[in-house]
Design a protein with these regions (language model features):
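Long, acidic (Asp/Glu-rich), low-complexity accessory segments flanking structured domains
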Residues: 1-14
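An active-site metal/cofactor-coordinating segment within enzyme catalytic domains
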Residues: 3-6, 33, 39-91, 97, ...
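Short, cationic motifs built from Arg/Lys/His that form the positively charged side of catalytic pockets
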Residues: 9-10, 36, 133
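Histidine-centered active-site/metal-ligand motif
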Residues: 9-10, 51-52, 185
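Active-site beta->alpha N-cap acidic-glycine motif
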Residues: 19
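Short amphipathic alpha-helix
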Residues: 22-23
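Catalytic domains of carbohydrate-active enzymes, especially glycoside hydrolases
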Residues: 26-41, 161-169
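Short loop-to-alpha-helix "cap/lid" segments that border enzyme active sites
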Residues: 71, 80-92, 96-236
Length: 236
């Protein structure tokens, strides 16, 4: 992608409480072009954004699937609240923690007028995503994994993703190299890298051709973007 997407991991979590509407808003003000979060379903079928998917009730912790949406702590946003607050130019990357969320998320985004080709749905089982490709042909699907888990090899995986209509391979930044991004691009798939927290890591990621990077530190990420991408980007 030109330019690559700069995803704020759980919003501007290095600067504000993670996965909250203020954190997401701050990330965009700091220049992030994408937002990342995790989506779960409540007991009454509401898609909500939270990392762990558990809620403390008294001395106990309950999974999100056992909690009614109206009883959630106020800081946990629903996906509807989140998506309706966004500028339509932003990108959104969601880790699908409950596969039941796939259709409601796509439907809510469409109802809000959010461009579905800016919605990136990530899951560690690419075949589960492939099974859902026909449900929503416009949404972006992302295979989130580690290189060590790709037993068939990166080239075979990239070919499988192309055949299945999965748009992107997302791995830890340490799994990527310039040669591997080139291989993935040869199959017309995109390459995303996560856990990119430091200047050198971000700079190297942009230089090797990653199409999307994820960082907690939006200020560092955007400084790196200015150094490595902005002078060559079609957007500027």
């Amino acid at each position: 992608m030109n330019p690559p997407i700069a995803f704020a991991h759980r919003g501007a979590r290095a600067h504000a409480p993670e996965n909250t509407l203020p954190a997401f808003s701050l990330a965009l003000r700091l220049g992030a072009t994408g937002l990342e979060s995790d989506v779960w379903m409540t007991a009454d079928g509401v898609a909500v954004l939270d990392h762990d998917g558990v809620v403390r009730t008294g001395l106990r912790k309950k999974p999100m699937s056992e909690i009614m949406a109206k009883t959630l702590p106020q800081h946990i946003p629903t996906f509807d609240e989140f998506i309706s607050s966004l500028d339509k130019t932003a990108h959104v990357s969601l880790d699908i923690k409950d596969l039941q969320a796939f259709e409601p998320v796509c439907r809510s985004a469409g109802d809000a007028g959010f461009p579905l080709d800016h919605l990136w749905l990530c899951h560690p089982d690419w075949q589960e995503l492939a099974n859902r490709r026909a449900l929503e042909p416009d949404v972006r699907l992302v295979d989130s994994t580690r290189l060590a888990k790709i037993s068939e090899g990166a080239e075979r995986r990239a070919a499988s993703l192309r055949e299945a209509g999965i748009d992107c391979l997302n791995m830890h930044h340490s799994d990527w190299s310039g040669g591997l991004t080139t291989l993935v691009h040869r199959f017309d798939r995109l390459a995303f890298g996560w856990d990119m927290q430091f200047d050198q890591v971000l700079d190297n990621g942009f230089r090797m051709g990653l199409d999307g990077v994820y960082s907690d530190h939006v200020d560092r990420m955007m400084d790196s973007f200015v150094r490595e991408i902005e002078p060559f980007s079609e957007r500027f």
